[in-house]
UniProtKB/Swiss-Prot annotation:
Subunit field text: Part of the 50S ribosomal subunit. Contacts protein L29, and trigger factor when it is bound to the ribosome.
Name the UniProt record assigns to this protein: Large ribosomal subunit protein uL23
Organism: Prochlorococcus marinus (strain SARG / CCMP1375 / SS120)
Encoding gene (name): rplW
Keyword annotations: Ribonucleoprotein, Ribosomal protein, RNA-binding, rRNA-binding
InterPro entries found in the cross-reference section: Nucleotide-bd_a/b_plait_sf (IPR012677), Ribosomal_uL23-like (IPR013025), Ribosomal_uL23/eL15/eS24_sf (IPR012678), Ribosomal_uL23_CS (IPR001014)
């Protein structure tokens, strides 16, 4: 685990990604998260296991290229993101959608 995230594992995971492709992965116990672009696989594994109390058996990460963004005559780049697909052990799950009993 890198020294950067040793103190605060909650800073590793930014948010879960809820897309059509990511939702299909839920059937086979795969969850997709947007993570800090400096996080390594051991950091992501430690953060998911500690925050959600589950057992991680595999992680795939990808760094898509940054996209250009233009507002008027000013151009810039969007923030760099890293996607992590986390595979959980059999019998473990993360509740992404809270049950609404209203």
């Amino acid at each position: 685990m890198t020294e950067m995230f040793k103190e605060r594992l909650a800073d590793v995971i930014r948010r879960p990604l809820i897309t059509e492709k990511a939702t299909k992965g839920l059937d086979i116990n795969q969850y997709t998260f947007e993570v800090d672009h400096r996080a390594a696989k051991p950091d992501i594994k430690a953060a998911v296991e500690k925050l959600f109390d589950v057992k991680v058996i595999g992680i795939s990460t990808m760094n898509p290229p940054r996209r250009s963004r233009r507002v008027g005559r000013f151009s810039g780049k969007r923030a760099q993101v890293k996607k992590a697909i986390v595979r959980l052990a059999e019998g473990n799950s993360i509740q992404l959608f809270p049950d609404s009993e209203s």
